[in-house]
UniProtKB/Swiss-Prot annotation:
Part of the tripartite efflux system PvdRT-OpmQ, which is composed of an inner membrane component with both ATPase and permease domains, PvdT, a periplasmic membrane fusion protein, PvdR, and an outer membrane component, OpmQ. Keywords: ATP-binding, Cell inner membrane, Cell membrane, Membrane, Nucleotide-binding, Translocase, Transmembrane, Transmembrane helix, Transport. One of its GO terms (cellular component) is plasma membrane. The gene is pvdT. Belongs to the ABC transporter superfamily. Macrolide exporter (TC 3.A.1.122) family. One of its GO terms (molecular function) is ATP binding. This is Pyoverdine export ATP-binding/permease protein PvdT. It comes from Pseudomonas savastanoi pv. phaseolicola (strain 1448A / Race 6) (Pseudomonas syringae pv. phaseolicola (strain 1448A / Race 6)).
């Protein structure tokens, strides 16, 4: 004897229990259905027929009893295998049509094929052919609200047939239709039955049930009658119908839906875009958090990087081969060490030293006419422009003869020129008072800019070392020594040679201090990096707020689209498919927000550049901020997506 395609044994289904009363909906159903049968299950409202249909269609599980499908115990199947059965074996036709409102007729029909991994061209052609066969060839692009009830039900039937529809489960298919549309739907079901499909019709209307070849009546959760209206043998089964012998193999091969992810991803992206467009205002408010977050991170990092590059360029312009030598106290109670001019001469003889220059200077008051200014005044020798790569742009630097004669001449920095003389007065040849001592301006240094913080290299005046010692400070000993090494790549070696010589000259006393420009540049770079990190971290808080907004909107979306989730599950979507669907939508929000944030950041950066603010956009910073937006979408979209994936199919389908 042929194995029944569907075999129910003592099926019971109960709800409630615990704190709520126990309700027994099915009280022990025994039922067998063979391939090729057209069966009507009839009963009054509350008789349990819809619950039975949900169990038959693998949307729900019985409380007890045994359900064998093609010889396989359904209770032993996992969630992915049940999804495969819903996708490949069953086709649902619901009383309320259950079409996705935002999708066209063709997109609704194609849904089961997407989850089956059918190639796009093949599923487009099959969906169009099914709709044309059902008289909807001209309505493929219409949304459900643009179709009549009968047309929507025909779309539902086409969807049920998309993957073959070996077993058609029709729950009150004519209940919401007028008599003419109802007759058309029943004629379609008759035709499907005649082609060998198993048709299981759930209805309370005995006239509708009479169209079937077998009528099973249910009352109070029990089968009260099982009548064959046509004693002839069942029609031959659909040639593609599932057979017991290969079901387990097909389940193991097909439950993974290999290749389906591409179609699902495209479907998820299209669905996400439709939902975003339909709820444009809400989407814009949600995106605002991501946009502001990404823009803030990018701009903050760009400002930090711009400031860093500016400072590094200015510091590097003084030369990375520079070493500074200062006297210092070896301990808190000892006097500060002194570097003499004789020691300067000895250091200048080292082969590692290219040039050496003593500096005797300090902050001093400067006046020209009735304009007062405070500036650093440094007594240097003629090596100053060469050591610091600092050319004179107006006039000339003082000469060796000026140094020998302690001439009262001065070369002023760019900022000093601006403060004392403005744009229109030629400073060359003019006399300024430095601590009330007159000095003639012979040159103006090129603009360098501030190196760090409030230190402005352009706010300085260079005078001969001898003039500084005699005319201003009254001391021959230098304030500090500037040393230019021969090899910029081996400053450490030169520093070691200088330290060894000073150890001998100072009899081993550590009353001096050596610092080099390269180390200062590295330290400043670390400081600037820390500042940039701090700015980026502050800005990232707004991105976090944007992520919370994404999670909020996705939770609302899951709640609003609970029925859609149920529809997708009924057409064969696995939990992982639903998870991917809603996770993709969350990422889509983040992608759009991230792109808009990057564009906004570039616009803000352009505005800052016009305002003379140092800004430097880097690919890692922009890509990193965008990647953070994507990660934010994944992290904050995961919980809503997981919630959607865990919904019960029956509860989702019946939600309002």
């Amino acid at each position: 004897m042929q194995t029944p395609l569907i075999d129910l044994r003592a099926i019971r289904k109960s709800y409630g229990g615990g704190d709520s009363p126990l309700v027994n909906v099915l009280r022990g159903i025994d039922l067998s259905i063979h391939a090729g049968e057209f069966v009507a299950i009839v009963g009054a409202s509350g008789s349990g027929k819809s619950t039975l249909m949900n169990i038959l269609g693998c949307l729900d599980r019985p409380t007890s009893g045994e359900y064998l499908f093609a010889g396989e115990n359904v209770a032993e199947l996992g969630s992915d295998e049940l999804a495969w059965l819903r996708r490949e074996a069953f086709g649902f036709v619901f009383q309320g049509y259950h079409l996705i409102p935002s999708g066209s007729a063709q997109e609704n029909v194609e849904m089961p094929a997407i989850y089956a991994g059918t190639p796009a061209a093949e599923r487009h052609a099959r969906a169009a052919a099914l709709l044309d066969r059902l008289g909807l060839g001209s309505r493929t692009g219409n949304r459900p609200h643009q179709l009549s009830g009968g047309q929507q039900q025909r779309v539902s039937i086409a969807r049920a047939l998309m993957n073959g529809g070996h077993i058609i489960l029709a729950d009150e298919p004519t209940g919401a239709l007028d008599s003419h549309s109802g007759a058309e739907v029943m004629a379609l079901l008759d035709e499907l039955a005649s082609q060998g499909h198993v048709v299981i019709l759930i209805t309370h209307d005995r006239e509708v049930a009479a169209r079937a070849k077998r009528v099973i009546e249910i009352s109070d959760g029990l089968v009260v009658s099982d009548t064959a209206c046509d004693l002839s043998a069942p029609r031959s089964a659909n040639p593609a119908a599932l057979q017991a012998v290969d079901l387990r193999k097909r389940l193991s091969e097909g439950s993974g839906s290999r290749g389906a992810w591409k179609g699902e991803l495209l479907d998820a992206v299209q669905a996400a875009w439709r939902v975003m467009w339909i709820n444009r205002f809400r989407t814009a408010l949600t995106l605002l958090g991501i946009v502001i977050g990404v823009a803030s991170v990018v701009v903050m990092l760009a400002v930090g990087e711009g400031s860093k590059r500016q400072v590094m360029a200015q510091m590097s312009s003084f030369g990375s081969n520079i070493i500074y030598l200062n006297g210092k106290a070896p301990n808190p109670r000892a006097p500060k060490g002194i570097i003499t001019l004789d020691e300067v001469a000895a250091l200048g003889e080292l082969p590692e030293v290219k040039m050496i220059m003593p500096v005797n200077g300090g902050q001093a008051g400067v006046r020209y006419g009735n304009v007062d200014h405070s500036s650093y005044v440094g007594g240097n020798d003629t090596h100053f422009p060469a050591i610091f790569n600092w050319p004179v742009v107006e006039g000339s630097y003082f000469s060796e003869a000026d140094e020998q004669s302690a001439a009262a001449v001065a070369v002023i920095g760019y900022k000093v020129r601006q403060k004392l003389f403005g744009e229109h007065t030629d400073p060359i040849g003019q006399y300024i008072l430095i601590e009330n001592v007159p000095f003639q301006v012979v040159g103006v240094l090129e603009e360098k800019g501030a190196t760090s913080g409030d230190l402005d290299s352009d706010n300085r005046i260079a005078i001969p070392y001898s003039a500084a010692s005699i005319r201003l400070f009254g001391s021959q000993d230098p304030e500090y020594i500037t040393i230019a090494t021969r090899d910029a790549n081996n400053v450490k070696h030169a520093e070691e040679a200088i330290r060894n010589l000073l150890q001998r000259l100072h009899n081993g006393k550590q009353d001096y201090e050596l610092t080099n420009n390269a180390a200062m540049i590295q330290a400043e770079a670390r400081t600037q990096n820390t500042l940039s990190l701090m700015l980026g971290s502050i800005a990232a808080i707004s991105l976090l707020v944007g992520g919370i907004g994404v999670m909020n909107i996705m939770l609302m979306t899951v709640r609003e689209r609970t029925r859609e989730i149920g529809i997708r599950m009924a057409t064969g979507a696995r939990q992982s498919d639903i998870l991917r669907q809603f996770l993709t939508e969350a990422v889509m929000l983040s992608v759009v927000g991230g792109l808009a944030g990057v564009v906004l950041a570039l616009g803000m950066g352009a505005a800052l550049l016009l305002s003379k603010v140092a800004v430097a956009f880097t690919v890692p910073a922009v890509a990193g901020a965008f990647a953070c937006a994507l990660v934010t979408g994944v992290i904050f979209g995961f919980m809503p997506a997981r919630k959607a994936a865990r919904l019960d199919p029956v509860a989702a389908l019946t939600s309002e």
